[in-house]
Amino acid sequence: MATEIEVHFPGDVQVEAHIRGFVISTDQPEKSGGNNSAPSPFELFTSSIATCAGYFAVKFCRARNIDTAGMSLKMAYDWDKESKRYPKMSVELTLPEGFPEKYRGAIIKAMDQCVVKKHILEAPEFEISAVYSSEAPNR
């Protein structure tokens, strides 16, 4: 069965995604006509990359009984005005105290397993359509 996300429009330019019983709210910054009440869709997209890498870092440490206290991750990206996109995104993991040097390369490889990033590198086909409510399947 396909995974489905139901999207609702609560007002202004706010958009909500409903998935697995969770509600993910988005908005736009004021300069883009929003109320800045939630992250923008692009901020959620980039956050999903960062949190996915973080998940794999934590999973790596847990499998080796390495304490994650003090471990942190940040992701940075800069806008390129000419290409009108973010040409590079950098993920940096700050290792916890006592992290074994022998695992530094391995934890990077673990973070590289992020499924979100893999879907960017091997992009799925996107199919976009519009239907009238009378044509939509019953939900």
Question: Could you say what each language-model-derived stretch is?
Answer:
Residues 1-47, 57-139:
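Extended beta-strand/beta-hairpin segments
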